[in-house]
């Protein structure tokens, strides 16, 4: 499995962060490339719950995320899209000024045939890491707004 990740310090506690992260109605404000929700099961955000969403035209296409873990320090989903499949995890540990957060994606490419490794090394991993960083930056803005309102 390949891996891309981003880190930040955010002003909310881990439970507050996971509540915000799993609120699909808020995703347009922070998830990179999110255009619209197509489907959401009643069990979301519990394990087995699923959301299907569509990206902007220049994005990932149709994305399906199924919750695989919702523990005290992490929220993980199995991610399926045209170009890859993998596990996305938001981890949060308490810190003096909120939480230390890591957003990671462990993935396998489903395209590029025998050139997968080269494509990943030269283009894909960096693009994914940059997208995770942008998502985490926008999530930080949402977390700061959430803190201000509480």
Residue ranges and their predicted role:
Residues 1-43, 138, 150:
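Hydrophobic ligand-binding cavity/cleft-lining segments
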């Amino acid at each position: 499995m390949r891996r891309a990740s981003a880190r930040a310090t955010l002003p909310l506690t881990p439970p507050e962060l996971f509540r915000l992260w799993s609120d699909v109605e808020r995703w347009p404000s922070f998830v990179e490339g999110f255009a619209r929700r197509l489907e959401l099961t009643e069990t979301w955000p519990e394990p087995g719950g699923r959301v299907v969403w569509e990206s902007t035209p220049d994005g990932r296409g149709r994305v399906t995320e199924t919750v695989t873990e919702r523990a005290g320090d992490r929220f993980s989903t199995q991610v399926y899209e045209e170009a890859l499949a993998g596990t996305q995890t938001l981890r949060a540990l308490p810190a003096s000024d909120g939480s230390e957060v890591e957003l990671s994606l462990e993935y396998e490419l489903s395209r590029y045939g025998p050139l997968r490794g080269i494509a990943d090394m030269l283009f894909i991993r960096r693009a994914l890491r940059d997208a995770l960083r942008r998502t985490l930056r926008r999530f930080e803005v949402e977390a700061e707004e959430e803190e201000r309102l509480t």
